[in-house]
Regions:
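Ligand-binding pockets and gating/stacking loops
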Residues: 1-125
Length: 125
């Protein structure tokens, strides 16, 4: 629904590829909520999309599906991805150890990523 953004993202990705920088650059385009189909005036907080490019990931695919029927696009119908899953995938794409823990004040261990996170394996090389 945003032709100018499509053109800008395509130009950025093409430029990074031509310069040999795409595999070393991770581009993520996202918002904090989904939009209703059609004119996009409503907010669907339970189903939103992200776009990933480069970073050595397996890109050019659609992972998951939103609902059809009465309220199309209002909910996740297949392959849900949680915020911890997203973060785990991002960290792995950047070469970080998602099992690492840091010590907070008071010697309280703080995990890099929530232990329930399941990386989006379909995207990882």
């Amino acid at each position: 629904r945003s032709p100018w953004m499509d053109a800008v993202m395509a130009t950025l990705i093409s430029d990074l590829k031509v310069r040999g920088m795409l595999d070393d650059t991770l581009v993520i385009w996202m918002g904090e909520f989904g939009r209703t189909p059609g004119d996009g005036n409503g907010h669907f907080s339970k189903a939103w999309s992200t776009m990933w490019a480069g970073g050595g990931l397996k890109t050019g695919q659609v992972i998951g599906k939103t609902s059809d029927g009465k309220n199309p696009g209002s909910a996740v119908a297949e392959r849900p991805v949680t915020s911890p899953d997203f973060l785990a995938t991002l960290c792995l794409a950047l070469g970080m150890d998602i099992h690492k823990e840091f010590m907070a004040p008071g010697n309280r261990p703080m995990p890099m990523v929530d232990k329930v996170a399941k990386p989006i394996t379909e995207m990882l090389g």
